[in-house]
Amino acid sequence: DNVRGREMVLTPGAAGWTSKAVDLPDNATISIASASDKSDKAYLSVAGFLAPTTLWAMDAANPAPTQVKAMPARFDADGLVVEQFEATSSDGTKIPYFIVHARDMKKDGSTPTIMTAYGGFEIPMTPSYAAITGKLWLERGNSFVLANIRGGGEFGPAWHEAGLKTKRQIIYDD
């Protein structure tokens, strides 16, 4: 969902399919760690900018997940927030980006910021836990930006192809 992980339980019924969201952390990357076609149970791996990889157990009959195990936190994320915005590229396309910063950060351009982006080989750049960035950069009141530029795999083949060959300049514009 706009580069933000979502997990849904889909259930077939007489009138079609119904969906119910699974309550997991926002602004995260969610992966299925284990599942079976013989069971309604699954394990999910969840990681975000402010939380290390965590294993969650869930059952489709009761989509309230249970935390099983988490990697240790390597920096203090208290007082930090993650927001997602969109910038407008040179051709009018909306380019999503995440910004991780102190909750009380002044939005006046004065906060030192590391910005990263990668638009190539259909590789998506999704939220991930970076202990060194957190410890040495975010804990000192600085901010971090991840831009989801074209050429990557965040929105499928068309997003990737929009930055290929003669259209390569567009990823720099993004």
Locate each region found by the language model.
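Short loop/turn segments that connect beta-strands within beta-propeller blades
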Residues: 12-15, 60-61
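A short beta-strand motif characteristic of beta-propeller blades
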Residues: 18-23
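Structural motif
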Residues: 3-11, 50-57
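Intrinsically disordered, low-complexity regions
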Residues: 6, 14-17, 80, 110
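Serine-hydrolase catalytic core recognition
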Residues: 30-174
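Compositionally biased, low-complexity repeat tracts
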Residues: 1, 9-12, 88, 152
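Conserved beta-strand positions in repeat-built beta-propeller and related beta-rich domains
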Residues: 1-2, 46
